[in-house]
């Protein structure tokens, strides 16, 4: 399994990596622009990501805009909704406006508010069907 962790804070990236590393390879991006480039490259190389963990507040292009661009690119490539990359928004923004934007405009799969624990993230990844119970 492949994961793309997108966060401008190194501590958050390390926590997410620690959580996901037992399940697959982790790549990193520090802003939305890098995330879009990494996502497109992986898709074009036929080695797509299974999950993107995306922060919202980042320099350059924020997480909300990056998710919209990723979904737009998937649509242009003819990827059906059931085959789209799973995206978990992992952010300090717990307000309804950001959650609604993530789900309805960006079509995020899930939304977690920081701080998060390893257990909470893995529970969410299980809920979206990427990790199966033994």
Task: Give the positions of each predicted feature.
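Two-component/phosphorelay signaling modules centered on CheY-like receiver
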Residues: 10-28
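Alpha4 helix (beta4-alpha4-beta5 surface) of REC/receiver domains from two-component response regulators
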Residues: 65, 77, 82-83, 94-110, ...
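A Lys-centered signature of the CheY-like receiver
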Residues: 113-114
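Active-site beta3 strand of CheY-like receiver
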Residues: 43-53
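Receiver (REC) domain active-site loop signature in two-component systems and cognate sites
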Residues: 58
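Active-site T/S-Asp motif of two-component receiver
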Residues: 52-55, 66
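Helix N-cap/capping motif at the beta->alpha junctions
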Residues: 28-41, 63
């Amino acid at each position: 399994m492949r994961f793309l962790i997108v966060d401008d804070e190194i501590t958050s990236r390390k926590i997410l990596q620690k959580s996901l590393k037992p399940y697959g390879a982790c790549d990193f991006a520090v802003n939305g622009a890098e995330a879009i480039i990494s996502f497109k490259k992986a898709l074009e190389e036929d080695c797509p990501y299974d999950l993107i963990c995306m922060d919202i507040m980042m320099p350059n292009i924020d997480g909300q805009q990056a998710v919209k661009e990723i979904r737009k690119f998937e649509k242009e490539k003819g990827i059906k909704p059931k085959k789209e990359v799973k995206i978990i928004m992992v952010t300090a923004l717990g307000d309804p406006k950001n959650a609604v934007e993530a789900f309805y405009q960006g079509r995020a799969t899930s939304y977690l508010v920081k701080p998060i624990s390893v257990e909470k993230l893995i529970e969410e990844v299980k809920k979206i069907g990427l990790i199966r119970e033994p």
